[in-house]
Amino acid sequence: KAGKQKVRFQYFEDCYKENAFLAEDIRQTVQNGVPLSEIAVLFRTNMQPRALMEYMVSANLAFQTKDRIPDIYEHWIARDFFTYIRIAQGSDSRADFLSIMNRPKRYIGRDSLPDETVCFDEWMKLYEEQPWIAERIEKLWYDLKHLSRLSPYAAINYIRRGIGYDDYLAEYAEYRNANKEDFYEVADEILASAKGYRTFEEWFAHIEEYRQELKRLAQEKRRNQNAVTFATLHSAKGLEFTKVYLIDVNEGVMPYKKAVLKQDVEEERRLFYVGMTRAKESLTICSVKKMRGKEVELSRFIKEAGKEP
């Protein structure tokens, strides 16, 4: 059966190019008479399809999910970014300041903000005896002023590198005995999402539309509807589709980065085979050269299957 389908391999510069191709190719496939319900996009982890799903929402292509896709904009890292942006746009809410004032560490005490609203001048006066903290508050004021003039992508970048939020993530990861790369991955996803939007209004409107779609998907669980199926390789077992796309077939994703032992890699190889054999007629395997701005290697499974570009 694996021998019968038409297999093609696509190699992209990055995930943006990959997603643009997928949305357009799915549209073409439907124009050629294949119903949406006979098309599937398969992936290794439920974090992967966010950008493509946002693309599908914008392109007005219906899809359903076999797995619960986490809302990345609900993540505490995203909430911190949005809080910085809210304050930069004029919020003086004590709650907003409390949530980010020590991310990164500025050694500012919570009791320095007794009122419901924050006034920078009064705040700095409180620390006249500790000028090094007053300086940090002043720097925060300058950072927020600068932030208010940036595009969404530049703003997230500045929060991470200019303000030092990535340093906070590294410290927090160490404190929690977690891997900082996992936190950076979330931050990278949010940064990638902001790309291409000139204003916060545009970006936030897009986020809202996507979140509504996620909610609707969760409520409706629209099965057997005419919609493209999005599924992890685990959830795809036993299903078959006329046309299948396997996305992000790169080292670190497929096989997954946590698969180190021989038997774990073997299980990943089996999953890859599961993905390949879901296609009745046409299989497209997609890989990228760069993911979240970093160079990534082609998956060893592609080489083993003799599908190298």
Model-derived segments and spans:
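Conserved helicase C-terminal RecA-like lobe
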Residues: 35, 53-54, 82-308
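General small-molecule cofactor/ligand-binding pocket signal
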Residues: 10, 64-66, 231
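Residues that form or flank phosphate/diphosphate-binding pockets in enzymes
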Residues: 17, 50-51, 73-76, 239, ...
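Helicase P-loop NTPase motor core
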Residues: 1-62, 89-90
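Structured loop/turn residues at secondary-structure junctions
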Residues: 14, 44, 69, 233-236, ...
